[in-house]
């Protein structure tokens, strides 16, 4: 799905997504990633929600977000609370949704100038 909104805010804009990829700044990514308006971390370790561990959010914490959008893959799966403990302990708001919805939400929130980070799981095996 194409996203038309280019807010001009930040350096990293999600332009499109489908079940197996996300396009940011005209580059197609096919693996999990962390993206914020000013930092992109491709090749984020978890390949599925089952792979996700609390310590995977260490790099998210270093970005000091007010909101983290967790894209759980092709389908929304509610993540167990223990996987989110690092964020919960720092009182960082977490919104979990399927990765497509996370891409749309990221685009909407950066247009508002919010300090957000999207942690997107892209699982090409299911």
What are these model-derived regions, one by one?
Residues 105-111:
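Conserved phosphate-binding catalytic cores of ATP/NTP-utilizing and phosphoryl-transfer enzymes
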Residues 95-98, 118:
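General beta-strand structural signal in soluble alpha/beta enzymes
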Residues 42-43, 76-79, 105:
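Short active-site-adjacent helix-start/loop capping segments
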Residues 1-52, 58, 63, 111-126:
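Non-catalytic interface/targeting segments
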Residues 99-104:
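Short acidic loop-to-helix transition motifs that present clustered carboxylates
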